[in-house]
Amino acid sequence: QSVEVIQSDRIGAALAAARKFGSVVVLKGHYSVIASPTGQVFINPTGNSGMATAGAGDVLSGMIGGLMAQGLPPFDAAVAGVYLHGKAGDLAANRPELAGAQASLVATDILAHIPFALASLQAGDVSYLEERLLQSVSSL
């Protein structure tokens, strides 16, 4: 399918790919979509345009793989990984020295902010919407 077709129905495209390949699919972008072959869908509320940078996807795949290695099921690991990755990117982009210049983010900025993203989640620093969406994650 073309980029235009996928972007016109991101949820449908992610679900179709998940069902076709029998795998959890992460469709990165503004409000990344995670879909499972059984029809579960999560739309991620975290992240920013500065994260469209070389190496950011490598950081994300490492996070998801690490969560799976700790025993989380693939869908939960993808949801938690994408959420924390986006939260780390948001924290990195909001540093005072960047003065809102998200375009200057590099993958190591995201990597460096993962512990802070995890700490903020563990401290309950989430909005009501994020709390509701995170209920699909069984544990961290």
Task: Name what the model sees in each region.
Residues 1-45, 119-140:
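Glycine-rich phosphate/dinucleotide-binding loop and adjoining beta-alpha-beta core of small-molecule
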Residues 2-10, 71-76, 97-105:
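Short, charged, surface-exposed loops that flank catalytic or proteolytic processing sites
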Residues 10-19, 74-88, 107-115, 129-133:
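Short, well-structured alpha-helical segments that form the helix of a local strand-helix-strand
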Residues 31, 49, 56-60, 64, ...:
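Gly/Ser/Thr-rich beta-alpha loop segments that engage phosphate groups in nucleotides
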Residues 41-55:
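Short pre-catalytic strand/loop immediately N-terminal to key active-site residues, enriched for Gly-Thr
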Residues 53-84:
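Short, small-residue alpha-helix embedded
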Residues 89-140:
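Charged C-terminal helix
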